[in-house]
């Protein structure tokens, strides 16, 4: 792998079972593309997952499932480093150092903790959830990542990463690369099929608006055909006045590579039913092979385990070197063997 490429790192939680269309179009698809231009490190972040209670058997199964889906989506272990976060203990070790450099007020200002703890109740939220962004800092700095692909909602965490890298470097000497946010350009924002005013998410009030990539293709087609639209009949993109139709056009355009103006022209004089029927077919053509590829990896656990073991080995080679340097700079007494 060309070491002169900028290094990029990102991760996905293993808590949801099936990826949904928003995950795929909003992040995973871009990860696949970044393999071509970057030295890419991708991980299933199971340490982050346990910041809220998890059933151990489900966590284990969902970690394997997330890895299988990433491979099915097009991540190539020959062109990127794919691993499970807990297979690289240096993440937790560096996180402790970063915790000790982070101000309490600084951590308190992280909006994601406020949002998540508000849902759980502050008394029930774990310290792990509170320091979640600091573990994310360690994830990034361990690999000396130049860029971190993020959506706008994660920008605050990248600012914390930059602050802590500069703080450590200023106090102990140049150690960490100060990363830049790689804001995912042209990321399709996919909305709920039943309520196009909210982002597609597992936490929606009804599963009818959510396209899970591992659902039966017939169920996926039915959800598309049942998508909420408006009382008009003209198919055109207008996110403010026609959010439902605009969402369907975005999905269609993103999956097929057809421009929205081209789609508007194609459906001139046709009703919403025609668009929904065609999009349902596009979705089925997409999810069917994705499901099959995911299942192939799940049916061959030895190959999946081997890919993850090799990925962890490659990741640890980088992480151990960074941690060793950080330990030395902080002043820890080296262990003699």
Curated annotation (Swiss-Prot):
ATP binds at residues 13-15, 22-23, 151-153, 190, 199-203. GO terms for biological process: tryptophanyl-tRNA aminoacylation. Its main location: cytoplasm. Its EC number is 6.1.1.2. Gene3D superfamilies: HUPs, Tyrosyl-Transfer RNA Synthetase. It catalyses: tRNA(Trp) + L-tryptophan + ATP = L-tryptophyl-tRNA(Trp) + AMP + diphosphate + H(+). A motif ('HIGH' region) lies at residues 14-23. One of its GO terms (cellular component) is cytosol. Keywords: Aminoacyl-tRNA synthetase, ATP-binding, Cytoplasm, Ligase, Nucleotide-binding, Protein biosynthesis. Signal peptide: none annotated. InterPro entries: aa-tRNA-synth_I_CS, aa-tRNA-synth_Ic, Rossmann-like_a/b/a_fold, Trp-tRNA-ligase, Trp-tRNA-ligase_bac-type, Trp-tRNA_synthetase. L-tryptophan binds at residue 139. GO terms for molecular function: ATP binding; tryptophan-tRNA ligase activity. Catalyzes the attachment of tryptophan to tRNA(Trp). Belongs to the class-I aminoacyl-tRNA synthetase family. This is Tryptophan--tRNA ligase 2. It comes from Streptomyces avermitilis (strain ATCC 31267 / DSM 46492 / JCM 5070 / NBRC 14893 / NCIMB 12804 / NRRL 8165 / MA-4680). The lineage of its organism: Bacteria, Bacillati, Actinomycetota, Actinomycetes, Kitasatosporales.
């Amino acid at each position: 792998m060309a070491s002169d490429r900028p290094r990029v790192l990102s991760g996905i939680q293993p808590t949801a079972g099936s990826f949904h269309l928003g995950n795929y179009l909003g992040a995973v698809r871009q990860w696949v593309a970044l393999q071509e231009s970057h030295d890419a490190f991708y991980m299933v972040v199971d340490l982050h997952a346990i910041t809220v209670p998890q059933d151990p058997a489900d966590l284990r199964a969902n970690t394997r499932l997330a890895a299988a889906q990433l491979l099915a989506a097009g991540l190539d272990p020959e062109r990127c480093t794919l691993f499970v976060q807990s297979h690289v203990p240096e993440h937790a070790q560096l996180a402790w150092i970063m915790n000790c450099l982070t101000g309490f007020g600084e951590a308190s200002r992280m909006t994601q903790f406020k949002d998540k703890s508000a849902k759980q109740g502050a008394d029930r939220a774990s310290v792990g959830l509170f320091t979640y962004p600091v573990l994310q800092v360690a994830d990034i700095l361990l690999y000396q990542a130049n860029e971190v692909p993020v959506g706008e909602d994660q920008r605050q965490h990248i600012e914390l990463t930059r602050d802590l890298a500069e703080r450590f470097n200023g106090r102990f000497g140049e150690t960490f690369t100060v990363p830049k946010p790689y804001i995912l350009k042209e990321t399709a924002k996919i909305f709920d099929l039943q309520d196009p005013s909210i982002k597609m998410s597992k936490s929606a009030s009804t599963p009818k608006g959510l396209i899970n990539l591992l659902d039966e293709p017939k169920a996926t087609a039915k959800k598309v055909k049942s998508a909420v639209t408006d009382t008009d009949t003209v198919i055109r993109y207008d996110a403010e006045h026609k959010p439902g139709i605009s969402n369907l056009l975005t999905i269609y355009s993103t999956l097929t590579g057809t421009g929205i103006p081209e789609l508007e022209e194609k459906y001139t004089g046709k009703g919403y039913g025609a668009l929904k029927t065609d999009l349902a077919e596009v979705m089925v053509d997409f999810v069917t092979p994705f499901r099959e590829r995911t299942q192939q990896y799940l049916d061959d656990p030895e190959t999946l385990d081997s890919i993850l073991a090799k990925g962890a080995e490659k990741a640890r080679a980088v992480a151990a070197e960074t941690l060793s340097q950080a330990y030395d700079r902080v002043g820890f007494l080296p262990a003699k063997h």
